[in-house]
């Protein structure tokens, strides 16, 4: 009991005192010299750093995120080139995403700062540039627009369109399954964006609810869907053959999100085409209609096996109000063989159109309140230089597993099965002279006849 208390105390950061906060505010350059003088003069009689932070945030001189960082003693990392960091939006294996503003253009963007290990070599740097150049060709109302990409002081970043709305994973978790007509409309719009990308020779490879953002049309207030994150994209047109190896697609590595991963993508990342995206879209459709993934529970390997071997429970069984025609669309999208699915997003659009209609919906974008400024920890938020604080973790991130021992941690088998898997992994490592194997390698062995 005492040790737990001591541990909690050790994890709780100490906020700075008033004088340190004011000094850090000046060093941060978040305010102009005139703003700094005026603010400190007006707040000269305020003794608590937290009260000063609350006042500056209420006057819109600081964002809540910036105020928290300053209270934790940070005074650098608020700028990346022309961009001022306003907030942290999320994080994943590839890096972190911030809300930022281009100071000259006064344009708010989503700034994706890649983790250093993602672009370690010169070759990786070249591939990064090729990928973002391809992404810059995607100008479509159902795809998040890429504005800028650059490297500053070893930090690679992409500036993208900022969408002021939730992703569908978060929305469904909070509100439950979508109305049937709205779910059809969301999938219709996502398929429209995928068709455009398909015509440009691009396969997304990580379609899932978390990568579909919602925003309201400024005039009609109807829902608009935006596809996010072509970071795992594969280029299929001859003009992009030089980019078929991306910084995010190492040979024999399973990448994507297990709950939404097509059978063929778990076997061979480089042979996927648009039909793989359609399978993932079908899994997403299933989630929007039922509020659950097609194969809930189990380990990552369990999920991948079930995607290959089992049929998901039909959506009209889980939700009896779903029309049979809609359930049949979901079932066809999730066919195990690519040849049994819709062959292009256009094929899907033709049959889905009667069920989709522009819809209105409301949501509230929630942000941390100033009352929480005293209850923050210092683990998962990071500014582009060195700052670390806490944020809400993403429930589902893309998966890449390539270490032989880590596979054994994921495989949910009994002790006897684990020994068989370990012997296979170690034998293969020795035979091939490799340092590790991927989940795909283990699955290939399981698929040959040892799966339960």
Each PLM stretch: what is its role?
Residues 444-452:
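Juxtamembrane boundary at the C-terminal end of a transmembrane helix
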Residues 4, 48, 73-313, 339-340, ...:
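Conserved ATP-binding/catalytic core of the eukaryotic-like protein kinase fold
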Residues 2, 6-61:
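N-terminal anchoring/assembly modules that precede and organize ATP-driven motor systems
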Residues 321-334:
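Conserved C-terminal C-lobe helix
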Residues 339, 343-412:
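Juxtacatalytic C-terminal regulatory tail of Ser/Thr protein kinases
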Residues 26, 30-31, 57-62, 207, ...:
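Non-catalytic alpha-helical coupling and interface elements of nucleotide-dependent molecular machines
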Residues 414-429:
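Short, low-complexity patches enriched in S/T/P/G
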């Amino acid at each position: 009991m005492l040790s737990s208390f001591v541990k909690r105390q050790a994890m709780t950061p100490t906020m700075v005192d008033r004088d340190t906060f004011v000094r850090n505010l000046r060093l941060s350059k978040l305010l102009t010299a005139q703003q700094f003088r005026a603010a400190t003069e007006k707040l000269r009689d305020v003794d608590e750093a937290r009260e000063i932070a609350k006042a500056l945030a209420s006057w819109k001189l600081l964002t809540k995120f910036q105020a928290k960082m300053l209270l934790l003693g940070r005074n650098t990392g608020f700028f990346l080139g022309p961009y001022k960091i306003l907030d942290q939006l999320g994080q994943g294996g590839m890096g972190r995403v911030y809300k930022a503003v281009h100071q000259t253009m006064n344009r708010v963007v989503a700034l994706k700062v890649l983790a250093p290990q993602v672009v370690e070599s010169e070759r990786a740097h070249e591939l990064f540039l090729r990928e973002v150049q391809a992404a810059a060709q995607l100008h479509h109302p159902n795809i998040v627009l890429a504005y800028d990409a650059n490297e500053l002081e070893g930090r690679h970043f992409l500036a993208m369109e900022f969408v002021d709305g939730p992703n569908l994973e978060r929305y469904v978790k909070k509100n439950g399954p979508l109305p049937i007509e709205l779910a059809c409309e969301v999938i219709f719009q996502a398929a429209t964006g995928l068709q455009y990308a398909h015509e440009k020779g691009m396969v997304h490879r990580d379609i899932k609810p978390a990568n579909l953002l919602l925003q309201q049309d400024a005039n009609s207030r109807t829902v608009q869907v935006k596809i996010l994150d072509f970071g795992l994209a594969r280029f299929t047109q001859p003009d992009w053959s030089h980019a078929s190896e991306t910084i995010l697609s190492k040979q024999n590595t399973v990448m994507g999100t297990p709950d939404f991963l097509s059978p063929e993508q778990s076997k061979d990342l480089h042979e996927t085409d648009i039909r793989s995206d359609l399978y993932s879209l079908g899994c997403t459709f299933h989630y929007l209609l039922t509020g659950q993934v097609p194969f809930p529970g189990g380990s990552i390997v369990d999920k991948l096996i079930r995607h290959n071997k089992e049929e998901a429970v039909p959506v009209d069984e889980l939700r009896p109000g779903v029309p049979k025609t809609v359930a049949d669309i979901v079932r066809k999208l999730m066919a195990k063989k690519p040849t049994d699915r819709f062959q292009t997003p256009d094929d899907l659009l033709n049959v889905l159109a009667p069920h989709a209609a522009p819809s209105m919906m409301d949501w509230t974008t929630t942000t941390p309140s100033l009352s929480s400024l005293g209850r923050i920890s210092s683990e998962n938020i990071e500014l582009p230089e060195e700052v670390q604080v806490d944020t809400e973790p993403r429930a589902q991130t893309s998966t890449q597993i390539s270490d032989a021992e880590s596979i054994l941690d994921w495989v949910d088998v009994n002790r006897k099965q684990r020994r068989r898997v370990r012997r296979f992994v170690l034998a293969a490592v020795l035979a091939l002279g490799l340092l590790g194997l991927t989940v795909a390698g283990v699955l290939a062995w399981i698929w040959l006849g040892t799966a339960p």
